[in-house]
Structure formats: structure tokens, C-alpha cells
Amino acid sequence: MSHPLKAWFQCHAPQLRLAVRVAVAGVVAYVIGSAVHLPQVYWATFSAVLVTQASVGGSIKAAVDRFIGTAGGAAYGGALGTLLPHAEVQHALLLLVATLAPTAFLAAIRPTFRLAPVTALIVLFGTALTDLTPLQAAIDRVFEITAGSLIGIGVSLVVLPARAHDLVGEAARSVLVLLVELIAFVNASFQQRPSPVDVDDVRARLVTALALVETTAEEARRERRTYLASEPDPSPIARTLQRLRADIAIFGRAAVETFPEPIRTRLGPHFAGVADTLSAFLLKTGDALAHRTAPPELGDVIKTLDLYAAEMSALRDAEATRQQPTEVAGSVFTLSFGLQQMRADLIDLRNRAAERARD
């Protein structure tokens, strides 16, 4: 296999595994549904495909949501269809309103029920071409969708299974890579050099990456609640990443100021040292989170932070900051505060990575 093709497969391995699971789930659901003579086997096939997610925890959540929405909508639609006449057009319109309004409202306030309006309609009007009563149709739909959902979960557990706890580490690494790009922008601004990255694009991708960490962490918590995993709670990782982003935002806003001499000349090399060691630590920690290995030590980062703090103290003793405008002095101290705040969060990040290490 050529190197570019191999690299492409490695880069898209999670997506390829998901594609295989979805295909297997659909085929298995159709075969089993046909073998047991489900009334409408395609509902089981649809459910198996929709339930199969990127992780086992995601599949469980999708299955639970689908079952709750389907059962609620089918029960409501079946009851209305049985109790209320709808042969006449005017009756059908009233029944349509009575069906959609409550279920749509419920779906709006409880996203778990987002399938309820559709299922209720299917139960009500899907019987027009069959001899089934609405109640019989409701029972069939719930049975078919439940069967498909269980098949989807089973395939997620057996075929190239992906645990959300492992995906959390990969998602966290993506966030840390983007934080390193932000640090490169901040350092370039401090040194009054052109930015090596498009900061607006980085910030937009960072929002998406952090949201993915939150979603994956929730799926991992669901795996823990269903006893499919006994890993540490991933929630602290998501919170630590949010705090690190806030830390970088704090000292980043201060660093983009144009500092006069001698502040920029004296602090610039030390800030560059912090940026270099911090970036190296975050990248190595991201790899450790993704591969479940021991994280790197913080010694180099702490050393450069201490050197920066010492130079800042020397500037303060020399009253260099008092000679500057209030805005400049405020930015200098904000920069120092952000860096010191980040020290505690870096220690927390390393501890969280160490908890997840398997070696």
C-alpha cells in the first residue's frame, strides 16, 4: 500500500470503522427481521442504522432516545386513532392538530421525544393501506424499532467496537493542538511578528472541538452508567480544557498589546520560552491522552514560567511598569496573572492524563 493511501486510511480510521458498523447493522437487521417475519422489516433496518453511532455510549443514547420517542409517539397516536374518528376530512384535520401540537411541544422541551410526532403520524395514517388498527400498528412499530435498536447496540459492541472513553482522548488531543496554534498566534503578537495561523479559523474550530469533547464525555459517562466501562469519569478533562482555553484567552488579550521598551525587550524572550515549552507539553500530553500513555513532566514549563515571573518581579522592583500608562501596566499584570493561573490548570491536565494512562 502506498504511503499516501496508508496515511489516508490511518487518518480516516474512525470514520471507516463507523461505516463498517453501520453497513453490518443494516444488513443484520434486515436478515433477522426477514427471518422472523417482521410486518415491516424496513423499520428495524432504519433503526439499526440510525442507532449505530461512533461509540458504544453514543449508540446506547441513540437507542434509548429512539425507543422513548417511538413508544411515546406510538402510544399517543394509537390511542387517538382508536378513540377518535378520522374518516372525514374535517375529523382528520382535527386529529392531525390533536396529534402534532402536544407531541411537538413535548419534543421541544424534551429532545428525547423528538421522534414522537413522526411516529404518531405514522401510526395514524400508515394504516390507510393495511388492515391494521392504529393500536395494532403502534405495537408493531414499537416492536420493530426496538428490535432494530437492540441489533444496532449489539453490532456496536461486537463489530470494531469504539469506546467513548478512548474517543475522549482523541477529541482532547484535537483541542490541545488548536490551543497550541492559539499560543503561536499570541506569541507572534507579543513579539510583533506576523501570525503563523488564521486566528479566527482556529477559534471557530476550537469551539467545535470542545463541543465534541463534551459530547464524547457524555457518551463515556453513559457507558459507565450501563457498566460497559469502568474507566475514570472523563468530565474533569472537559472542564480542564475549558479552563485552559480561558487562561490562554486571558493572557492572549493582554499579549496582543504593543508593549513599549523596556518591557517588550525584557519579557519577550521569556514569554517565547513559555510559549515553546508550553506548546511542546500540550502536544505531548495530547498524544498521551489519545494513546492512553503516561503524560510528560511539567518541569520545563514550570522552569520557563518561573523565569518569566522572576523577570516580571525585576521589572516591578525597577518600577518600570509605573512609568507606563495605566492601560499598559494593566495588560502587563493581566498577562502575568493569566500565566500563573494556567500553572494550576496544567498540573490538573497532567493529573487527568495520568489517570487515563494504561501503562
Regions found by a protein language model. Give the residues of each.
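A contiguous, well-structured pocket-lining segment that forms one wall/lid of small-molecule binding clefts
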Residues: 238
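Short linear sequence motifs
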Residues: 23, 35-39, 244, 301, ...
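Long, hydrophobic alpha-helical segments that serve as membrane-spanning/inserting helices
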Residues: 1-17, 31, 167-234, 246, ...
